[in-house]
Amino acid sequence: MAVLRPFDKLPELNSATILLVGAEGGPQQQLAEAMLREKKDFNINIHLASSLPLPSERDHLRPRIDLIAFVIDIKSKYSLKNVQASLAYVDVRFFLGKVCFLVTGVGRANNCSVEMNAIWKLGEDYCSPVIFCELELEGIRVATAQRLLRMLQICAGRVPGVSALYFSLLMRNSAGD
């Protein structure tokens, strides 16, 4: 049960890796497929995990992870607890701009099982942006995929002059406005 570390491995040339953690099933898979369909000028590796830690026996085959997106389903308290438990297996250096919280199901606020304050507090405690979306709607799923790809591109160091930490600070400041 190893802790994920952001700089343990060398980056791969012309590629970036994102890890989607949480909210098992269709929406997470559909988001990954939407990301793969988008036009991009670099190779993308998408890994899906229901929770952390990742199995250590395949660690030597796993590429360097550039961005971790924790997926929280707003209608499932288990989803939030799963993400909170998984955070213990992430090295603190990932929280310097290489983590975001993706909250799904916001279109069904009347079926909400998770306190919004708990989600905002999670983002604040871990200095990471919180992104709200509805992955069941195609248009919003595509927009979310594009946004995550741009974040991944920045986190992988593929945008000159913009670091992951700087971008994360910009996102956090704009969320408070």
From Swiss-Prot:
Q: Which Pfam families match?
A: CENP-M
InterPro entries cross-referenced by the UniProt entry? Centromere_Cenp-M, P-loop_NTPase
* Subcellular location(s) of the protein: Nucleus; Chromosome, Centromere
The keyword Nucleus is assigned to this record? yes
Q: Does the keyword Plastid apply?
A: no
User: Which cysteines in this chain are paired by disulphide bridges?
Assistant: none
Q: Look up the record and report any one GO term of the cellular component aspect.
A: nucleus
Question: Which keywords has UniProt assigned to this entry?
Answer: Centromere, Chromosome, Nucleus
Q: How does it assemble?
A: Component of the CENPA-HI complex, at least composed of CENPH, CENPI, CENPK, CENPL, CENPM, CENPO and CENPP.
PANTHER family the UniProt entry points to: CENTROMERE PROTEIN M
Please describe what this protein does: Component of the CENPA-HI complex, a centromeric complex involved in assembly of kinetochore proteins, mitotic progression and chromosome segregation.
Q: What's the protein here called?
A: Centromere protein M
| Native species | Gallus gallus (Chicken)
Q: What is the lineage of its organism?
A: Eukaryota, Metazoa, Chordata, Craniata, Vertebrata
- Which gene is transcribed and translated to give this protein? CENPM
